[in-house]
């Protein structure tokens, strides 16, 4: 289907192999749509069962495939045997909070004491500092774990080593060829790691470490000798799935298994902090990726963005219901403050940005922009403009930046290279996001550096992307049975995108604005079927205007299915991404994704 739409995008039907579809239907007892979706995703026949039923034990490799894993487990065992004090330094985002809680809750289950340190974003910035490690030193801590950070923390780790403190880094951010002089660095994205686990977030890396440590303690008969029940690590997958979803890593292989099983653990509400957040958010249905990514995650992140940076980790570690409710309530309030700050800054930038809009990498700066929200505003602009965006908050003669990128442009690599060339003071990140500090006098130099790197990419990765559709369905297919067939391929996310469908020849019965920015509408199909739809953030846009006006013209919609659960009732609605009034469809797809 090739159709120019209200958004100016072309629609294309994805290709599938009919022989494969027939084989899958006949041999796996699956229906037409599920078989077609598996064919489109090019799932190998021998992998179909594991894809539809991803289980961690079937995907997880020997943790020792990660460099430094074995020595880290042995060092931690020695610390436990010697009653050494343990410190955990975590990042202030969801992945950092989840990783801190994973390690902390495990140590708690072993009846071991530990101290955590979450830096203040505004005062201390990202990653360990000499100041933070001095606090550990004053508490006579001899073993420090850094989680979701540490790979580029040369000064702090040198300070620790000089003071006879061992540092174990559990991270996933890209490294330089030179590594800090830590006791060990477990990071699938360190330059010399060959584990093929580069898509793990920090929570995934931390879980791998716990698997290794748990095995070490079992082999050494520590549980038996100390009359302590061995922890069931499956119960920790709620935290792993939370970090995995909120850090937006690819949901393929092991990550997909983490999330699939993790959602089941979240449903059991074993973690008091997660349970309290679910209650605060009034989530009464089975938790989904949406709930993690758009409801729980933003609240945990809000502490690090505009409130108290340690609240997220403390909530996920907490065992007291009253304290848990207090922390979750504060995070909920911080999130409301974050929304206002974000909206104001986004509007300010959109109003003032008249230059640089044609640059392939948009780099903007402003005095005293709130450091806690520039990252999320950069993400909004990146989605709107479909290009990498870097926002720099200026204070005195230093700028602090947050970057968000698009597929095909490795922003973490760009930041590390610019740091090595002394354009930046310090910085780091991964393929899709990063951060750095810079002298104001070097901003133009960095801008030229980033744009030059972008232009070295052969393909035009920033051009407007078409909408790729998995199938054209009838209005009568919008029901619970069809939704459940599609949901067999979940969880959906990067690497396993949610299926998109087109529905042809519809009329609007009615439409209304909800929450001041969305359009709910009721549509009528040629077959007489009535479907409920919603178009998010469509007010004052062509899409929204079309749905609100009365006309008898037939039109087509593209989007995805959504399950609405309310008071025990389940209804399927269609989320509209785009509208086309063109009837000239053809079953073609660009050869690039054939």
Language-model segments: which ranges?
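Short alpha-helices
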Residues: 102, 181-224, 237-245
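Acidic-glycine-rich active-site phosphate/pyrophosphate-binding loop
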Residues: 78, 177-187, 524-528
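Generic beta-sheet signal
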Residues: 117, 147, 170-172, 186-188, ...
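Short gly/pro/ser/thr-enriched loop/turn and capping motifs at secondary-structure boundaries
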Residues: 122-124, 153, 173-178, 192-194, ...
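Hydrophobic, well-structured modules enriched for small/aliphatic residues and gly/pro motifs
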Residues: 93, 150-153, 167-175
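Intrinsically disordered, low-complexity regulatory tails of plant transcription factors
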Residues: 153-154, 247
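Mid-to-C-terminal polyanion-binding domains and interfaces
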Residues: 4, 74, 78-85, 323-329, ...
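Hydrophobic helix-and-loop "lid/oligomerization" segment in the mid-to-C-terminal part
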Residues: 6, 14-143, 163-164, 215-445, ...
């Amino acid at each position: 289907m090739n159709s120019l739409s209200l958004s100016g995008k072309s629609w294309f039907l994805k290709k599938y192999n009919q022989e494969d579809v027939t084989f899958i239907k006949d041999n796996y007892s699956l229906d037409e749509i599920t078989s077609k979706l598996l064919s489109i995703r090019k799932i190998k026949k021998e992998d179909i069962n594991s894809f539809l039923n991803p289980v961690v034990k079937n995907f997880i490799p020997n943790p020792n495939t990660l460099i430094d894993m074995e020595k880290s487990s042995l060092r931690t065992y020695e610390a436990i045997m010697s009653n050494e004090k343990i410190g955990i330094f975590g990042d202030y985002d969801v992945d950092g909070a989840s990783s801190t809680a994973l390690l902390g809750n495990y140590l708690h289950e072993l009846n071991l004491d530990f101290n955590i340190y979450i830096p203040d974003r505004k005062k201390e910035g990202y990653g360990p500092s000499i100041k933070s490690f001095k606090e550990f030193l004053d508490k006579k801590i001899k073993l420090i774990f850094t989680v979701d950070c540490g790979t580029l923390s040369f000064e702090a780790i040198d300070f620790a080593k000089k003071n006879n403190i061992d540092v174990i880094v559990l991270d996933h951010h890209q490294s330089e060829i030179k590594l800090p002089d830590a006791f060990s660095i477990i990071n699938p994205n360190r330059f010399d790691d060959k584990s093929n686990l580069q898509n793990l977030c920090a929570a995934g890396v931390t879980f791998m470490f716990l698997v290794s440590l748990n095995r070490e303690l079992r082999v050494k008969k520590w549980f038996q000798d100390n009359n302590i029940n061995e922890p069931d690590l499956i119960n920790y997958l709620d935290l792993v799935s939370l970090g995995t979803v909120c850090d937006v890593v690819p949901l393929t292989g092991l990550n997909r298994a983490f999330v699939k099983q993790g959602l089941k653990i979240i449903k059991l509400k074993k973690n008091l902090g997660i349970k309290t957040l679910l209650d605060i958010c009034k989530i009464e249905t089975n938790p989904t990726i949406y709930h993690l990514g758009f409801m729980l995650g933003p609240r945990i992140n809000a502490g690090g963005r505009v409130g108290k940076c340690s609240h997220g980790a403390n909530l996920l570690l907490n065992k007291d219901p009253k304290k848990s409710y207090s922390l979750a309530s504060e995070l909920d309030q911080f999130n409301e403050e974050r929304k206002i700050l974000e909206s104001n800054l986004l509007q300010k930038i959109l109003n003032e940005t008249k230059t640089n809009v044609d640059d392939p990498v948009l780099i903007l700066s402003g005095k005293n922009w709130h450091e806690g929200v520039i990252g999320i505003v950069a993400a909004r602009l990146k989605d709107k403009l479909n290009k990498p965006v870097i926002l720099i908050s200026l204070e005195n003669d230093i700028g602090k930046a947050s970057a968000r990128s698009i597929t095909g442009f490795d922003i973490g690599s760009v930041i590390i290279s610019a740091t090595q060339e002394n354009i930046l003071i310090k910085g780091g990140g991964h393929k899709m996001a990063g951060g750095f500090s810079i002298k104001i006098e070097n901003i133009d130099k960095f801008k030229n550096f980033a744009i030059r790197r972008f232009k070295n990419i052969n393909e035009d990765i920033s051009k407007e992307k078409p909408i790729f559709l998995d199938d054209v369905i009838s209005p009568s297919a919008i029901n619970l049975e069809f939704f459940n067939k599609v949901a067999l391929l979940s969880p959906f996310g990067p690497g396993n995108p949610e299926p998109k469908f087109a529905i042809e020849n519809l009329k609007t019965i009615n439409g209304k604005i909800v929450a001041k920015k969305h359009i709910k509408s009721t549509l009528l199909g040629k077959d007489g079927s009535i479907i409920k739809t919603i178009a998010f953030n469509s007010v004052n846009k062509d899409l929204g205007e079309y749905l609100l006006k009365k006309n008898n013209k037939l039109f087509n919609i593209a989007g995805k299915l959504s399950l609405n659960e309310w008071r025990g009732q389940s209804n399927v609605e269609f989320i509209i991404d785009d509208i086309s009034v063109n009837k000239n469809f053809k079953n073609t797809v660009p050869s690039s994704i054939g």
